């Protein structure tokens, strides 16, 4: 049996976009990165409330960047790039008959979509490939064009400093308090997301839950990634609403060979793509959480539930001293 690696999850919400333009082929991920082994160090980290961070949170636009179109992508020189898609988090496309990828997307232009569906010009300012087990995580600095024609960073960290993003296929429903829809991952083949560093979507990829990768059992980690975005935000009800505050400690583990449990903390709950399958009274909410119509599975925390739909189990130090 392969030894599991444990991490305690953290998410401070921020969003980023990016894509670049030099000429560099993405490295083929090693088997080690493909099965997402040992991707995160052991340690206690912090959670956060936002799914994709401070995305265009300004008075000029008054809306959020919810997705980015693959169609009509253009190179830095303005030429249309055809067949643009993501291989992992690296862009691939064609400039005529020439295949372009990796840093060749520096300066590329994309069309983003705001919450009301209106378009927003985006520009990839820089592209950088990750290293080691994260060599398949490409980082992008992305700007949007304001009404005055100037370019501003799409993503900012908690201190307001510009930050980068990871590109990931599909889009999310950012609404909160919407049963059955809020917080959902939408597998839209025409769109992708620029996931800002520090927010749940990007954070969960750094934990090893890369949607394009597979676990030690050979199964896709896409479901684990989505479950992680729910868990990090304490979206117990699966309606997109967070039941925590930034800076709460949380530990998570799985049976996929990505994160293992070494903490002796209190059980919080079990998670799948739709939210919590069950949870205890000792949660990061520090108050009672009620989900209308929710029926918890029995024997919460039983690790045999990993065989019947549970993706992750979370623990909190609620009531534990010495932290």
Label for each model-derived stretch:
Residues 23-323:
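Repetitive, compositionally biased segments used for assembly/scaffolding
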